[in-house]
Amino acid sequence: MIFTAENTLLIGSILLFVSIVVGKTGYRFGVPTLLLFLVVGMLFGSDGLGLQFHDAKDAQFIGMVALSIILFSGGMDTKFREIKPILGPGIVLSTVGVLLTALFTGLFIWWVSGMSWSNIYLPITTSLLLASTMSSTDSASVFAILRSQKMNLKHNLRPMLELESGSNDPMAYMLTIVLIQFIQSSGMGVGAIVGSFVIQFIVGAAAGYVLGKLAIRMLNKLNIDNQALYPILLLAFVFFTFSITDLLKGNGYLAVYIAGIMVGNNKIMHRKDIYTFMDGLTWLSQIIMFLCLGLLVNPHEMLEVAAVALLIGVFMIIIGRPLSVFLCLLPFRKITMKSRIFVSWVGLRGAVPIIFATYPVVAGVEGSNLIFNIVFFITIVSLVVQGTTISFVARILNLSKPLEKTGNDFGVELPEEIDSDLSDMTITKSMLEEADTLKDMNLPKGTLVMIVKRGDEFLIPNGTLKLHEGDKLLLISEKSKEEETDSD
């Protein structure tokens, strides 16, 4: 079956429905949803139910749009106060770590491809290109698994991995693009390569900062009667940021990530609506992107390089990633050995390497189909081996801790412009022994009870209300000066 105007909506809706149902099942058992989305795409593809989707350029465009949204949303969720203590190791891992992973893996691929038993041969530059496409990690899958297991990480590992995963995709992208240019232009020297890196970094970072500030200003100053248009305005900024940065020869992915950080760490109007919109859009983008990549691959072609791809994947998991991590973290003495081992293990490959593997295909690089199939196979190996063992490894290394509760049980949030905090409190037996009415409770100064939840019933509070064990109180209090400083 091929895609037509008549059946595209039907096929798309079925794929989305199946993906969500399968993803929900996998979420319960700690299986990466990314893996399941890819599998659904493969099952419906040319070697499965027969959906024909072979245009790498279309897949690349879909991936570019989806990745822009995902990186911007990831930037919005990155908080300055959380990443500040681990800024150094996070940045080193996302830059030097990517370079080292690409170098070690590329040299290994070149060595393996020259062996007599190998069914592939790749010159050194193509080997490095292959390694570069899969040198970035996908920590989003890691945290989805940890959330499904109700698990968090000790020693600031979570923000460090979030920072690495959010900022290492631009580095892998630059390596991929520069190596494609080098392969196709024999006259490109070392100076031109270094210059290209510097320009992409500087322009990308500057554009992200400036346009992020502009987005904040417009969201807060532009008076739109329909508040549902504010998230759409921000989405327009995401695409504008990527496109204008790319037009200026900068790194668009770096720009949207930095712009997301700027927006997420400043006061903006209609924050709740914007976050809800972006969260849903991010999930939709991931599902569509993974499905398209699953449809694009031909499993029978992938199996032809399975042996070599498996060997490369094992090298990356056991040697390449750990060696890069340990070298990058050498200057940071406070990071424990167990933490280094865990960071080495969670170098999960996701959809981004597959997207980057379409760039050589579109550019017509010799051996590009081979690169795509190897990257796809290694991504599946990584998700199966590493993705299903993350929580187990965290427990073995004693790095796991219970997931802290966020928000409140009432589903209520305050607008950003209201300078107060919401929290909730559950009444215990010991509390009732000291005070059994609201007026007798010793609440902190400046704290008010907004509503009381008793079972499924909501009660309007007054001073004489008799409290029961298990009652939940929604509290509003003045924001502390320390919190205000952190948010500025």
Model-derived regions, located:
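Transmembrane helical cores of multi-pass secondary ion antiporters/exchangers
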Residues: 1-403, 407, 417
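Short beta-strands and strand-coil junctions in structured, solvent-facing domains, enriched
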Residues: 78-81, 299-300, 434, 457-458, ...
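Short aromatic/hydrophobic contact patches that present stacked aromatics
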Residues: 92, 424, 474
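A glycine-rich beta-turn/hairpin centered on an aromatic-Pro dipeptide
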Residues: 412-418
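Short glycine-/aliphatic-rich beta-strand segments at the starts of folded cytosolic domains
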Residues: 419-427
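Cytosolic Rossmann-like ligand/nucleotide-binding regulatory domains
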Residues: 428-480
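Short, compositionally biased
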Residues: 465, 485-488
